[in-house]
């Protein structure tokens, strides 16, 4: 059996920035005194004239990024998700999204899996915040392959993009032939009894859950939803028609994230049971990332339980 490849999506982000730097001299990268952690430090070493560090001033960084974008540059502004989406929300809304500027926000260390840094750094509200902003695209890749493709797709998109990356090394889901398109989900496993729609590191957990459910005689469809906004309504509706029940899985508060986005589509277009796996509207705590994911129910076992419950509601 081949060894499982595990890579943090933040590492893929850093490598993709260097790739873009060689291709496009118009690309500028910014950070807020976290270059080593966000992996933008690699870009800094390669292209020092196109890297700017704002210091611990995320709000200023977003405004400077907006100014650079207004002059025709494509700017990647990087920080931890807590400080990018949380602290700099107003600047993202008014200076970047309102004028629809080409600023791509690289938000690393998202979710519970930040681990020992604790509740102050475990941002489980960022997707909800960014979903509420007009013009904003939200990407949450499942692995390093998809993370790279998200960055490459973001630079081609005209307007702001919020990209969510993790600290924890996660198993590779996709091979090098995988094609990513903004606004499109993709079916990883087909099934007839229940649909599991997952995003980020929960995609791998969804695949494990589907295998375990299969052993119990349950056929689960698994959909990877890397684009949270604009959500792929077509694949959601198609999945509901085929299975009649949905479970969403995300490393985010169940309020305002993937679960809410999917529920909105289902409620409006094809009513069916939808159950959500995610952070149950609570704050995090300090601890090893893998242990915290289990404590907060962000694992295959909880997806399986919700899937069985959803089937009973049909």
Describe each PLM feature range.
Residues 1-164, 169, 302, ...:
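Thiamine diphosphate
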